[in-house]
Amino acid sequence: PAVRRTALRIADGRLAEVGDKVKLAYRQNVVSAVLAERASKPVVVVALGDSITEGATATRGSNGDWPALLSARLQQACPDQVVVVNAGISGNKVMDHGRSHSALARLDRDVIALPNVDRVILFEGINDIRHDGGTPPVAGRNAEDMVLGYRQIAERLHSNGIRPIAATITPFGGSDRYEPIAAAN
């Protein structure tokens, strides 16, 4: 997936700015997670989703993705008590592999394997119901398929002591990616 963070720390600890004459790369190899022990045990929330969760439409480097905004609000309300992990990947689907492994396939690696996860906000599905990109258009998943996928995720999370929270799929009628064949399902 594309890296949408450009923040870089320089020697004095502040965030790098363009004027610092530091080359800021927009696509780069990154460490996917850094785990640190702490004295208190915060509530760990994983945001599992697609490009909406990843922050594909946020201004690059702004931390304008919804998990970062949620994290900032929670830090204001209850400092150091909640950690939000962004596990969004552009193009991700609940059931089928797209640009990446499906949410079902990556659930163990990206959520369950993380230590002390308490809750998961699942914001996935718009890519499943859109057509598959073929010509002629082929319908994506239907409502029954989606419910089955969501149930499988919920059951796996519950069996690991993690509370799932489902977000509503956003409407997409009128967007440049709207497909009547997908909306009919």
Where are these regions (language model features)?
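Alpha-helical cap/lid subdomain in secreted, periplasmic
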Residues: 61, 72, 76-80, 98-185
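Active-site metal-binding loops of divalent metal-dependent hydrolases
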Residues: 50-52, 89, 126
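Short hydrophobic segments within beta-strands
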Residues: 48-49, 87, 167
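N-terminal secretory targeting modules
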Residues: 1-48, 54-60, 79, 183
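Short connector loops at secondary-structure junctions
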Residues: 79-95
